[in-house]
A protein has these predicted regions:
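N-terminal "arm"/small-domain region of PLP-dependent enzymes with the aminotransferase-like
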Residues: 2-75, 79-82, 86
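Conserved core segment of the aminotransferase class I/II
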Residues: 79, 235-274
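Short catalytic/ligand-binding loop motif for oxyanion handling, primarily in non-cytosolic enzymes
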Residues: 39-43, 186-187, 219, 252-253
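Short beta-strand segments
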Residues: 34, 180, 245
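Conserved core of the PLP fold type I
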Residues: 57-207, 217-219, 227-234
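Walker B catalytic acidic pair
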Residues: 214
Length: 274
C-alpha cells in the first residue's frame, strides 16, 4: 500500500468555498460577503498609500535578505508593543513584554496555543459562543479540550454579559480564556470598559489565563479605543497574559500575513526565558 493511499480528502474550507462560488456566479449584482477583505467598486483590493510609500522606501534601501532572528524584525516587534501597550508603557520599560513576529494572527494564535500546551498540559480552553471557527481548531490541534462560554444572545442581538460572567466564574484555575479584544468575530458585539473591568476581575479571582485575540484594531472606534482591553488588563495588575494580533487587514496586506504574538510576564527575567 502506498504511503498516502489511506489519506482522506479533507472537507473544503467553507469561506474559500464561498469565494469560489462567488467567482463562478455570473450575476452582475452579486456581492461577496465571504472572505473578509476590503474591495473597491471594481472588486479589487486597493493598496493603501501608506503601504505604497513604505514599500518604496524599503525597495530604495536595497536591504539585505539575511536570516532574521527567531522573534523576527526587531523594529517591527517594538512598534507592535508600542501600539498595543502605549509608548510610555511601564510593562515595556520594565522588560515584561516579549513580542515575536508571526505569520498573521492565525500564526500568532498557533504559536501561543502550542506554547501554552507545554506550560499547562491539562488545561481547558474556553472560547466565546460563537467565535471565529478557527479558534477551536487551533487549540484542539494543540491538544487542548475546548469549551464555550456564553456570549451572544440571539433574541436581543447583543451581548449576554451575565451569562458570560457566570460561565467564566465556573472555570477551574489555570483554564485559558480566549477573549476578543475588539470587533468580536463573528457577532461584532463588544464589551464596554465597565464590562472589561468585571471580566478581568473574574480572571484574577479564578486564576485564569487571559489570551487576547485582536485582528481588527482600529476598525470600530479607532486605534486607541479598540486597544483599550489590552491596556485595561495591563493596568489591572494581571502579571501574565498573552496577546495575538494581526495587521493583515489593517494594512490590506492579506497575503503578506502580518501578525505578532506578545507575552507579558511578571518580571524581565521570566519574560526573557519565554
Amino acid at each position: 500500500m502506498s504511503l498516502f493511499s489511506a489519506v482522506e480528502m479533507a472537507p473544503r474550507d467553507p469561506i474559500l468555498g464561498l469565494n469560489e462560488a462567488f467567482n463562478a456566479d455570473t450575476r452582475t449584482t452579486k456581492v461577496n460577503l465571504g472572505v473578509g477583505v476590503y474591495c473597491n467598486e471594481e472588486g479589487r483590493i486597493p493598496l493603501l498609500r501608506a503601504v505604497i510609500e513604505a514599500e518604496t522606501i524599503r525597495v530604495a534601501q536595497h536591504a539585505s535578505r539575511g536570516y532574521l532572528p527567531i522573534d523576527g524584525i526587531a523594529a517591527y516587534d517594538q512598534a507592535v508593543q508600542k501600539l498595543l501597550f502605549g509608548n510610555d508603557s511601564p510593562l515595556i520599560s520594565a522588560g515584561r513584554v516579549i513580542t515575536t513576529q508571526a505569520v498573521g494572527g492565525t500564526g500568532a494564535l498557533k504559536i501561543g496555543a502550542d506554547f501554552l500546551k507545554q506550560l499547562l498540559p491539562n488545561a481547558v480552553v474556553a472560547i466565546s459562543d460563537p467565535s471565529w471557527e478557527n479558534h477551536r481548531a487551533l487549540f484542539e490541534t494543540a491538544g487542548f479540550p475546548v469549551q464555550n462560554y456564553t456570549y451572544y444572545d440571539d433574541a436581543s442581538h447583543g451581548l449576554n454579559f451575565a451569562g458570560m460572567l457566570a460561565d467564566l466564574q465556573k472555570l477551574q484555575p489555570g483554564s485559558v480564556v480566549l477573549l476578543h479584544a475588539c470587533c468580536h468575530n463573528p457577532t461584532g458585539a463588544d464589551l464596554s470598559q465597565a464590562q472589561w473591568d468585571q471580566v478581568i476581575a473574574a480572571v484574577q479571582a479564578g486564576g485564569l489565563v487571559a489570551f487576547l485575540d485582536m485582528a481588527y484594531q482600529g476598525f470600530d472606534k479607532g486605534i486607541a479605543q479598540d486597544g483599550q482591553a489590552v491596556r485595561i488588563i495591563a493596568e489591572a495588575g494581571i502579571d501574565s497574559f498573552i496577546v495575538a494580533n494581526s495587521y493583515s487587514k489593517s494594512f490590506s496586506l492579506y497575503g503578506e500575513r502580518v501578525g505578532a504574538l506578545s507575552v507579558v510576564g511578571p518580571d524581565a527575567t521570566s519574560t526573557k526565558a519565554v
